[in-house]
Design a protein with these regions (language model features):
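Class I SAM-dependent methyltransferase SAM/SAH-binding core
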Residues: 91, 99-154
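A short glycine-rich, Lys/Arg-flanked "PGG" loop and its adjoining helix->strand segment in the class I
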Residues: 182-194
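A short acidic, Gly/Pro-enriched loop at the edge of an enzyme's catalytic core
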Residues: 85, 154-166
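Helix-to-beta-strand junctions that scaffold the AdoMet/dcAdoMet cofactor pocket
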Residues: 108-109, 175-176, 192-194
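Conserved beta-strand signature within the Rossmann-like core of class I S-adenosyl-L-methionine
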Residues: 195-202
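Class I SAM-dependent methyltransferase Rossmann-like catalytic core
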Residues: 8, 13-15, 42, 52-82
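Core SAM-dependent methyltransferase catalytic element
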Residues: 234-257
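Short alpha-helix
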Residues: 133, 219-235
């Protein structure tokens, strides 16, 4: 019997396919341009190169990004709090298919429980679904210390001061409704215990990795200072911040009263 393996899917798979198709059309226009003369040649070549820069670049780049991410595990530094806090309650907001949530759950050696919520959009992640993440947790042997359910980042379905750690990994920039990130951080503050930790990772629009992966679409991401100011605005104290692998990473604390 064939061994079943977890399926984590690709981030923005549909975008990658769409961009790549349009980009390949641009490549075709560029090649055909050399078979014409004068203004038609120039028009086809310029149009083709433009389409390749705008679409083929990020299409291929985000494909490479997914391959790189599939081969990476969270470092001990990124999951340190799971070891330090005794029996922590952890929430991963926007858990998707569980790529990071399940890695965190594997670090829970001394009790504790990881919860994950998502709206399970297949636009964000290919194959994204509640039954997918639950199946992945079972196959990875952590279904006894994980709970996954539907839930929105701007209306988190848990009680006040319930969690020791809350994660937002590449989620806040996806909240396109007015005041979305503000509402999400208000919710994070509400559900965190005093002294609890907020962990945020967001793509850094200025990093060479993000530019290589996303091309001109790197501009959809915010600058470092935006996230820093937003975190402080909502009452958190930033403990650590760093830029690594194309991302801003923040570790902040909800002050004890």
């Amino acid at each position: 019997m064939k061994e079943r393996k977890p399926k984590y899917g690709w981030y923005v798979k549909k975008l990658i396919v769409g961009f790549s198709i349009v980009g390949l059309l641009g490549l075709s226009l560029t090649i055909f341009g050399f078979y014409f003369e004068d203004w038609m040649e120039l028009l086809l070549i310029i149009s083709g190169i433009t389409l390749m820069i705008l679409f083929l670049w990020p299409g291929l780049g985000m494909g490479i990004m997914n391959i790189n991410l599939s081969n990476k595990s969270l470092s001990r530094k990124e999951t340190k709090l799971s070891y330090v806090i005794k029996s922590p309650k952890i929430l991963d907001v926007g858990c998707g298919t569980g790529r990071h949530a399940i890695q965190i759950a594997k670090t829970l050696k001394n009790g504790g429980h990881l919860y994950g919520i998502d709206i399970y959009s297949k636009v964000a992640i290919g194959g994204n679904a509640l039954d997918t993440v639950q199946r992945n947790a079972h196959l990875e042997g952590v279904d006894n210390k994980t709970t996954f359910q539907y839930g929105s980042a701007i209306d988190i379905p848990f009680d006040n001061e319930m969690f020791d750690i809350v994660y937002f990994s590449s989620v806040l920039h996806e909240l396109h409704m007015e005041g979305g990130p503000d509402k999400a951080l208000d919710e994070a503050y509400r559900i965190l215990k005093p002294g609890g930790y907020l962990k945020i990772a967001e793509w850094n629009r200025s990093s060479w990795q993000t530019i290589v992966y996303c091309g001109i679409f790197c501009l959809v991401f915010k600058k470092y200072q935006y996230w820093s100011n937003l975190i402080k605005k909502h009452g958190f104290r930033i403990e650590k911040q760093r830029k690594i692998n194309g991302m801003h990473r923040f570790s902040a604390i909800k002050p004890k009263i």
